[in-house]
Structure formats: structure tokens, C-alpha cells
Amino acid sequence: MIKSSLILLSGGQGTRFGSKIPKQYLPLNGTPLVLHSLKILSSLPQIAEVIVVCDPSYQETFQEYPVSFAIPGERRQDSVFSGLQQVSYPWVIIHDGARPFIYPDEIHDLLETAEKIGATALASPIPYTIKQRNPVRTLDRDNLAIIHTPQCIKTEILREGLALAKEKQLTLVDDIEAAEIIGKPSQLVFNKHPQIKISYPEDLTIAQALL
């Protein structure tokens, strides 16, 4: 069993959600949203340390958990880089605080695949017809996927990829793209359970129904 560090990204402002409080700190069934995933992740034997990337004003939210903190950056990759400075294990799991649902069997699958490949992300097949906008044409959805977190990547690959992104002034849209840009392989692990990211108020209602 490989040991990994967890970087929990909880620094977003949730502008699409339209709340004065960042969405990851809003209550879901009486508990701050971000703590739903942290409760499960921090209990897993594969996770040896937790780094929470958040604004210092919200650190008190995590007082019941043995975590360290990092300051969020302007972009997602900057926040990941900030958390990465405290990582002390050869593998990193990265998760969004706005995604409350975590399943231990999927973490096992991610880590098992990452150990063989180097970088993995949780994903779902696309059930809809997908079209390119300009020019309009239909895309083969069988070759596309919806990407979620957690994502798992070898620490040295993540460091190298983020360094190259900084050098080339690239913006990465997810974490395993750090492997892609340095020519390292990655693989998707398809989810077995419902996945939802809280982006809009109605998503909280859906999440409540799934609890």
C-alpha cells in the first residue's frame, strides 16, 4: 500500500455560486461542505498527511483535524503549488473542497492505477451529445470524459509539470495535465458512485438528496 499526501483545495471564492461565504464552507446537512470529504479522506490508511489550501480566516473550520495549511494562489495550479511545498510523500492526492462525496473504493482504484501509470484522475463517461461550437460539428463522446477529483499524481511528476507550466506561462485546467505537458502518461479511472461539484445553489439541494 502506497502512502500519499492529500492537498485539499479550499481557497476558492465561489463567484458562480453567488454567496458571500465561499461555497465550500456553506452547511450541508449541518456540516461545512468541505468537511464531508475531509472526514473520509483523513480516515484512509493510504493518506499519511493532509495539507489544506485555504484563506487563513477559514483555518478554524479544520480545527478538529490534524492538518497543515498553505495559502491559496491566484489560479488553481498556484494553489496546488503552494500546497506542494509541504508535501513529504512520493504520491499526492488532490481534491476540491467543493466536492463532498468521497468513496474509499475509488481512492483505492486511483492509487492502484497511479502506482502503475504515474497520474490518474476520477472521470465519468459523457451521456450527452457533444458539439464543437465553431465550426459546429459533432464530437465522438466515446473518446471524451468528464473529469472530477480526486486526482492522484507522483509528487516528482507534479513538481516537474508545475515548474514547466510556470516557465512557459501555461494555465493548467486540472492536475494530471502537469503530467501531460512533460510527456508523462496518465489514465482515467471511471467512477462507480455519483459525483457532484457544488457550483450553483441548486447543487446543494442535489447533494442533500444524495446524502
UniProtKB/Swiss-Prot annotation:
Per the record, the pathway is:
Isoprenoid biosynthesis; isopentenyl diphosphate biosynthesis via DXP pathway; isopentenyl diphosphate from 1-deoxy-D-xylulose 5-phosphate: step 2/6
For the biological process aspect of GO, one term held by this record is: isopentenyl diphosphate biosynthetic process, methylerythritol 4-phosphate pathway
| InterPro entries documented for this protein | IspD (IPR001228), IspD/TarI (IPR034683), IspD/TarI_cytidylyltransf_bact (IPR050088), ISPD_synthase_CS (IPR018294), Nucleotide-diphossugar_trans (IPR029044)
- Site Positions MEP for the nucleophilic attack — annotated at 141, 197
Q: Which reaction does it catalyse?
A: 2-C-methyl-D-erythritol 4-phosphate + CTP + H(+) = 4-CDP-2-C-methyl-D-erythritol + diphosphate
Question: What superkingdom heads the lineage?
Answer: Bacteria
Q: What is its EC number?
A: 2.7.7.60
Q: Specify the signal sequence span.
A: none
GO MF, any single term: 2-C-methyl-D-erythritol 4-phosphate cytidylyltransferase activity
Q: Which UniProt keywords apply?
A: Isoprene biosynthesis, Nucleotidyltransferase, Transferase
Site feature location: Transition state stabilizer: 16, 23
UniProt entry tagged with the keyword Transit peptide = no
Query: Is Transferase given among the entry's keywords?
Result: yes
Q: Into which family does the record put it?
A: Belongs to the IspD/TarI cytidylyltransferase family. IspD subfamily.
Q: What does this protein do?
A: Catalyzes the formation of 4-diphosphocytidyl-2-C-methyl-D-erythritol from CTP and 2-C-methyl-D-erythritol 4-phosphate (MEP).
The protein, known as: 2-C-methyl-D-erythritol 4-phosphate cytidylyltransferase
Q: What is the lineage of its organism?
A: Bacteria, Pseudomonadati, Chlamydiota, Chlamydiia, Chlamydiales
Q: Gene name?
A: ispD
